[in-house]
């Protein structure tokens, strides 16, 4: 299904659940740009940090902590550009979501949902190759099972290029599309440019 400009069905409270800072922009940056002037409130949740997995255990802890802070600052700047303030950072260890009990990650998400009460949630895809992304998806499903959280009306998965398409035979297959203008796309690209450490030369996907 293709949805054009009428996004009222999303409700007035929308939550983006991302494994790491930058997944929100890669997956939903165009939508966030499109919603900027709409009468809705948006909350972005980051389950983990996105930096420590690039370092060996022998590297100094203070260097890793500085990189985590830097990336979180990138996230704040990118979201502020799109008119979104106060994202939540839970800073679970990057690349190690499988070392945490799934129920613990689910509780992080559930507590955020109970606090914000979104009508619509966007999160990662089941087919994503990145294990942190996949676990975030599974934990979101766990946290949104029909129960007391009856204010959640819509649940969508989004694509993160460089991981969701890199899964032979089981790549991301969307069944719902929201159209974006060139202006929306340009704003998404500009927002991602705040992530200075994530932009590299071809053939890097970003």
Question: What is the role of each PLM region?
Answer:
Residues 1-17, 34, 38, 65-66, ...:
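Metal-dependent de-N-acetylase/amidase catalytic core
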Residues 3, 9-21, 25-66:
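ATP-dependent adenylation/pyrophosphate-handling site
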Residues 26-27, 70, 104:
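Short, conserved clusters of charged catalytic residues that mark active-site
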Residues 48-50, 93, 161:
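Short beta-to-alpha linker loops that shape the active-site pocket of alpha/beta-hydrolase fold enzymes
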Residues 71-75:
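Generic hydrophobic, amphipathic alpha-helix propensity
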């Amino acid at each position: 299904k293709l949805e054009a400009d009428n996004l009222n069905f999303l409700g007035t409270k929308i939550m983006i659940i991302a494994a790491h800072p930058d997944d929100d922009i890669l997956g939903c940056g165009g939508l966030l740009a499109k919603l900027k002037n709409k009468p809705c409130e948006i909350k972005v949740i980051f389950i983990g940090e996105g930096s420590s997995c690039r370092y060996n255990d022998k590297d100094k802890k203070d260097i890793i902590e500085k990189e985590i802070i830097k990336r979180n600052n990138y996230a704040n700047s990118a979201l502020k550009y799109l008119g979104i303030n106060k994202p939540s950072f839970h800073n679970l260890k990057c690349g190690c979501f499988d070392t945490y009990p799934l129920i613990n990650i689910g509780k992080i998400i559930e507590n955020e949902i109970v606090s914000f009460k979104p009508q619509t949630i966007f999160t990662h895809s089941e087919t994503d190759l990145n294990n942190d992304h996949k676990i975030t998806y599974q934990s979101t499903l766990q946290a949104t099972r029909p129960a007391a959280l009856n204010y959640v009306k819509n649940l969508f998965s989004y694509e993160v290029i460089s991981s969701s398409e890199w899964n032979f035979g089981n790549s991301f297959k969307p069944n719902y599309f929201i159209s974006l203008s060139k202006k929306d796309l340009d704003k998404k690209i500009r927002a991602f440019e705040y992530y200075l450490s994530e932009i590299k030369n071809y053939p890097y996907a970003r």
